[in-house]
Structures are given as C-alpha cells and as structure tokens.
C-alpha cells in the first residue's frame, strides 16, 4: 500500500510464533528479512490491520497476544495493545509509527503452513532463534531482537 499520510503513517508488524519458531518473510522490494506487516488502512483499527496483514501475507489466522482491557462504556470497544511501539524513518520527510504485535496461529494442533505471497516476498520461513543469525541477507539487529523476544515470550505459552 502507498503511504496514506504525508509525514507519518501508522503500521503494524506481527511476529507470529509456533513451536519456538518465528515466521519471517524476505521482502522483495526492500531486500530485507522482516516480520509480517504493513500499513493500517483508514477504515481499520490496529488490531484489524494486524489480523488482515497476517492473513494476506501468510494465509494464517492468528490470535494476537496481549490483554484486552474491559470496556469503559457504550460505544467503546477495547483493543489488544501492541507489545512494543517504535517510530522509524522511511525517508527524509516520512516516518512510520510501528505497532509491534506478537501472535500465534489459531490452530495450535500441528504446524501452521505459511503461504508465500509471491507478489511481495521472495521467501517465507519459520526460524528458531539460532537460525535468525544465518539468514542472507542478514536480518537487522532490531528485527532480530523483536523476533527473539517473541520466541521467548510466546514460545513458552
């Protein structure tokens, strides 16, 4: 999706974990190993965007990890908050505020089979913490850190 706003866009990144492995994609355009994710569209909330992006990019339905607070009154719907937030520069004049979610496949019986989104990605794979170090091109330290925290936190649940 193209940028929605001129200065800052809101995005989601989803680190899906099963059996102590995290799902990562090799992004064609960026030539980087990344989690699933993308822009939050104007007609959706962050939770909806995380579920949509995960399904579009991997074919997997997931449960987001986190606490859903009680609602506070009529017209209020509580959302699962992201595990982390960051802001990262895309260009000299554009930034993304990233909402970083951890998730696990809804179907926990067996192994969820990820489907490659060929128009966007060169590869998709489940990696252990150790396998992240062997990816080519090398995964950024930040993405590797989030991946390892996700494996540690979700892999034990």
Question: How would you describe each model-predicted region?
Answer:
Residues 15, 51, 55, 148-151:
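Residues within alpha-helical segments
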Residues 21-72:
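Conserved Nudix-box catalytic region and its N-terminal flanking loop in Nudix hydrolases
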Residues 11-13, 61, 102:
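Conserved beta-strand residues within beta-sheet cores
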């Amino acid at each position: 999706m193209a940028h929605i706003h001129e200065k800052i866009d809101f995005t989601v990144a989803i680190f899906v974990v099963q059996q102590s492995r995290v799902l990562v994609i090799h992004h064609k355009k960026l030539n980087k190993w990344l989690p699933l994710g993308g822009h939050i569209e104007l007609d959706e909330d962050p939770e909806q965007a995380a579920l949509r992006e995960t399904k579009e990019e991997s074919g997997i339905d997931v449960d987001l990890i986190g606490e859903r607070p009680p609602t506070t009154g009529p017209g209020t719907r509580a959302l699962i908050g992201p595990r982390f937030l960051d802001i990262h520069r895309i260009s000299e004049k554009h930034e993304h505020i990233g909402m970083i979610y951890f998730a696990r496949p809804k179907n926990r019986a067996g192994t969820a089979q990820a489907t490659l989104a060929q128009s966007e990605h060169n590869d998709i794979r489940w990696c252990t913490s150790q396998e992240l170090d062997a990816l080519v091109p090398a995964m950024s330290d930040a993405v590797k850190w989030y991946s390892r925290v996700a494996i540690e936190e979700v892999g034990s649940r």
